[in-house]
């Protein structure tokens, strides 16, 4: 949940292509991506955090590791599945 707060309190993370930001986010959050456990009973905040982890953090990682073999499409696909769940499960997206 730390990522959720950090992400929404630092909107400069969203669209910047800044090496230091990419490095910081990658070092802090990329490894836990492989440990994500999906639970249909997760809260909205937990699900949104998982979407950020899956959809955004790999992009930051790939920018600082351009020769890595990560599959961004695979991560984004998982994030879109969680997004669909949120849309079905919750009436209010706030």
Provide a role label for each language-model segment.
Residues 1-94:
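Intrinsically disordered, low-complexity activation-like regions
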């Amino acid at each position: 949940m730390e990522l959720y707060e950090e992400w929404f309190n630092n909107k400069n993370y969203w669209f910047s292509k800044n090496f230091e930001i990419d490095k910081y986010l990658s070092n802090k959050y990329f490894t836990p991506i492989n440990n994500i456990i999906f639970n249909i009973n997760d809260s909205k905040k937990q699900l949104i955090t998982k979407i950020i982890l899956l959809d955004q953090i790999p992009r930051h990682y790939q920018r600082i590791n351009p020769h890595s073999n990560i599959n961004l499409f695979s991560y984004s696909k998982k994030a879109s599945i969680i997004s669909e769940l949120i849309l079905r499960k919750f009436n209010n997206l706030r």
